[in-house]
Amino acid sequence: MSVSFGTSGLRGPAIDFTGSTSAAYVRAFLDVICSGVPSRTVYLGADLRASSPEIAGFAAAAISAAGWTPVYAGNVPTPALAAYALARQAPAVMVTGSHIPEDYNGIKFYRPDGEFLKEDEAPVRNRA
């Protein structure tokens, strides 16, 4: 896997987010960071990059396979998804490349209590 955590979220070539890579990181996030969350709903969004719908599909499948309910918000701004999930004390997964080149993409994770922290990265990476 050639994806890695950067300044804000998981980043890498879009092709490297297809299939098992997206699923492994989403599952690790839920298992490690969200294990004690009573709500079993995860809010999921995507940006307008060509690769984002496919990556979001892999993320949704991983969320379901982990026993959670994905709620797909569609193409929404990252802060809107984060605020919506935070107001409901639920985790969120946003597929977005933000400012990086079009052939790259990324996944941002949001904890039920807010921002995914730098210290959250290693446990998720190690589990993935």
Question: Where are the regions that the model predicts?
Answer:
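Gly/Ser-rich phosphate-binding catalytic loop and adjacent alpha/beta segment
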Residues: S2-A128
